[in-house]
Amino acid sequence: MKSRNSCKLMLLNKNHLLSLWIVMSFHEAMLYECQSEGKVKCCLCARRCLISDDSTGFCMVRKNQGGTLYALNYGKAVSVGVDPISKKPLSHFNPGALVMSVAAAGCNFRCQFCDNWMISQDKEVAGRLFPPAEVVKAAKDSNCQGISYTYTEPTIFMEYAYDSAKLAHEAGLFNTFVSNGYMTPEAVKAK
């Protein structure tokens, strides 16, 4: 199973904004296995998609490019907001706390009744650039006590949530993961 590595394309451009966009657009995914004929097996959610070259998995945001799996939604927030922790709904964990809620495109379900269908099923993998360090800064600037990875399925934006959560923890913020739970044991143990 491959471990995660950041794409080094930033060195190829002098324009920082373009460089940041390239890095965010081609972030190597966590938890995948190389297969025969250039295919990769995504080991993040329980679907364990077998993805052909130049194709995406069921979630539409994990793409095989030449035998490397990329998270197309890394650092691209489709929804950001300050919420009370009770909205997550967590009533006994840090009652009264405010959290910075962050979502990126993609989901491993297709629930017809989903409140967030428009952002979770976005085929364009839209969103504004909102790198992990900016997520933490925005949370601190908004007097939030934590960050919640929510609205869409955070398992599908694991790399983004993982990097943000590490920085948040270092900054003294707590993290919550509002998930459908359809992930692999490897995802639960990811480091």
Role assignments for model-derived ranges:
Residues 64-191:
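Conserved Radical SAM active-site core
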Residues 6-97:
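Flexible, acidic/Gly-rich N-terminal and inter-domain linker regions that tether
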